[in-house]
């Protein structure tokens, strides 16, 4: 079985979502996990979640004689990548940065947009952003996207006692 399929089967079987998987230099395998959309109310992935998945993956990769040196399992972070249509559904209403493969002629030939994700309609994705002439809406498909990720929302103000 291919390494990516092996990792996805294991992670999904444990009740998590495989967000991304990378094979880096010197045999490093990085796995990014999150809760499934149904379990999103559990909050953020914890160290204990990563530890459980790491432990299981180590066993599976050893049994399957997979070629790797080191394994890292972590959460996708605050700037979580958006790769699947289900990601755009799940994070509708969130702020995101979307970089397209080709410039959009109806948007001043820009390729990079930051704005609020809208609920997808079929295969059509949408992002509301601040254009030169005020609020604008960009419609695109998953095939148009080069990279996309959430924009971290961090509040550095301390709570008042």
UniProtKB/Swiss-Prot annotation:
Q: Which CDD domains match?
A: YlxS_C
GO CC, any one term: cytosol
**What are the record keywords, sorted?**
Cytoplasm, Ribosome biogenesis
Family matches, as InterPro entries:
Ribosome_maturation_RimP, RimP_C, RimP_C_sf, RimP_N, RimP_N_sf
One biological-process term from Gene Ontology?
ribosomal small subunit assembly
Localization per record: Cytoplasm
Family annotation (Pfam families): DUF150_C, RimP_N
Q: Which HAMAP family match?
A: RimP
Similarity remark: Belongs to the RimP family.
Q: What does this protein do?
A: Required for maturation of 30S ribosomal subunits.
Q: What is this protein called?
A: Ribosome maturation factor RimP
Origin organism is: Janthinobacterium sp. (strain Marseille)
